[in-house]
């Protein structure tokens, strides 16, 4: 599994410039896209996807063919890019003012740049919770593309972070699934005594540490405060829940991993393989990884694989029902003369039967459409994970995509420093505050 969060952190560094470049020379008051108008079923509709390459590319090709069959006077032109190439293609198209009618987006700062730049159509009337289209999706997925009370994005597939565990290892050690963070730490000694690495962890790429931190932030910091701290103009990063989270993270690294201070030299795939190979009892992972750890050849079986949310610390001040994760989806070009047709196409693309296809092999992308991920077309763990994501009170996006690049980089360095022991929690927070001040 490729760490998709790392793409926007590189891309987002240029996103503001891209949007400005795309806006340069355009009329001062471009007409707003009327996405709620009756679509005119003629002409060419352009769509920039992130499904380039086998097997994903067939998904939108099949949808385009079906839509063209239903509406013979419409030609759907697909621009299919990969996870690696999408950011450069978006840069080129935005700078040349050739942004397609529909285009891929991540959540967080990346999407916000297109929204604030006037390049994303307001879809509130069509897709807000309570609308016919919006009710197809979990509210948390829709909220990931919400800005100032308006809804801009069409969530396509979902993801979330959970602790995966080996049920047999827990049985061997005589421990139960923990319900608090302290209980999680308390399971580590008996698991190690039973011959397992309690929690496999690899942070060579930097972002895995941030996944622990962001989930702990969601638990320990009130949601309004956390959201305000994602914006440099309103951020303070001074709630005591941050320092508590950093301390809890250090405890987990020191007490529950065999790699300890050397975790920064371990790949996340090595940690993943430790759980799959039956050597580790737990590994903190994304829903998209679930089927990897029980794939053919793995020691860990689907029957022995279980998941649970990272347990909530006692006396936490945040949201105990929040799940860290983020959907990926699409925006409609606010300046497209075919905005209504674009909205109609995306309604077609997210109909339940197509959402079920997306969630099934060979695609295996858990659709954000509620009910699309079933026990029949998905593994038990994926089904459970996506159900939990859909029922979450909110999705808290990856720390390195929801913050601006300067702050994200400070957190990446801070996570590594906490692991190695080269900085204290307060020193890490000082560096984040300094980066935030520089980003204002």
Which residue ranges define each predicted feature?
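Short, low-complexity disordered leader/linker segments with a strong preference
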Residues: 1-46, 69, 430, 434-440
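Hinge/lid segment of periplasmic solute-binding proteins
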Residues: 108-161, 185, 212, 241, ...
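A structural signal for short loop-to-beta-strand junctions that line the ligand-binding cleft
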Residues: 100-101, 133-168, 197-201, 318-323, ...
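Glycine-centered hinge/linker elements that transmit conformational signals in sensory
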Residues: 190, 231-263
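Extracytoplasmic "Venus flytrap"/periplasmic binding protein-like
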Residues: 66-136, 168, 172-179, 273, ...
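Extracytoplasmic/periplasmic substrate-recognition and gating elements
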Residues: 65, 69, 173, 254-257, ...
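C-terminal capping/gating helix-and-loop segments adjacent to ligand/active sites or protein-protein/ligand interfaces
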Residues: 364-371, 383-436
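Extracytoplasmic/periplasmic solute-binding protein
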Residues: 152-156, 161, 185-235, 280
């Amino acid at each position: 599994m490729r760490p998709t969060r790392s793409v926007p952190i590189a891309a987002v560094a240029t996103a503001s410039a891209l949007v400005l470049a795309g806006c340069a020379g355009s009329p001062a008051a471009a007409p707003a896209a009327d996405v709620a108008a009756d679509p005119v079923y003629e002409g060419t509709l352009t769509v920039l996807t992130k499904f380039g390459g086998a097997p994903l590319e067939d998904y939108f090709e099949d949808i385009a063919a079906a839509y063209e069959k239903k509406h013979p006077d419409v030609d759907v032109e697909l621009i299919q890019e990969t996870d690696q190439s999408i950011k450069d293609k978006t840069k080129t198209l935005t700078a040349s003012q050739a942004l397609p009618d529909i285009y891929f987006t991540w959540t967080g700062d990346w999407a916000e740049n297109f929204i604030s730049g006037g390049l994303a159509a307001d879809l509130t009337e069509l897709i807000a919770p309570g609308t016919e289209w919006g009710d197809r999706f979990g509210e948390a997925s829709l909220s990931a593309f919400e800005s100032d009370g308006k809804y801009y994005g069409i969530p396509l597939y979902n993801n979330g972070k959970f602790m995966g565990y080996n049920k047999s290892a827990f049985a061997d050690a005589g421990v139960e699934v923990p319900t608090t963070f302290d209980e999680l730490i308390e399971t580590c000694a008996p698991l190690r005594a039973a011959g397992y690495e309690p929690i496999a962890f690899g942070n060579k790429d930097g972002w895995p540490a941030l996944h622990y931190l962001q989930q702990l932030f969601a638990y320990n910091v009130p949601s309004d405060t956390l959201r305000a701290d994602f914006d440099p103009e309103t951020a303070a990063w001074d709630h005591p829940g941050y320092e508590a989270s950093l301390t809890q993270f250090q405890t987990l690294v020191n007490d529950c991993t065999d790699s300890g201070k050397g975790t920064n030299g371990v790949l996340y795939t090595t940690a993943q393989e430790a759980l799959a190979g039956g050597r580790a009892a737990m590994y903190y992972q994304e829903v998209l990884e679930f089927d990897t750890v029980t794939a053919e050849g793995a020691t860990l079986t689907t029957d022995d694989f279980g998941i649970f949310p990272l347990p909530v610390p006692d006396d936490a001040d945040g949201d105990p029902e929040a799940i860290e994760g983020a959907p990926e989806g699409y925006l409609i070009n606010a300046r497209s003369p075919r905005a209504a047709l674009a909205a109609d196409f995306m309604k077609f693309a997210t109909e339940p039967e197509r959402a079920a296809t997306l969630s099934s092999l060979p695609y295996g992308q858990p659709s954000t459409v509620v009910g699309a991920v079933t026990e029949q077309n998905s593994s038990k763990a994926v089904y459970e994970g996506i159900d939990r994501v859909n029922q979450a009170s909110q999705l808290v996006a990856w720390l390195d995509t929801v913050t601006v690049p300067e702050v994200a980089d400070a957190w990446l360095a801070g996570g590594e420093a906490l692991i190695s022991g080269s900085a204290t929690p307060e020193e890490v927070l000082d560096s984040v505050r300094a980066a935030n001040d520089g980003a204002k």
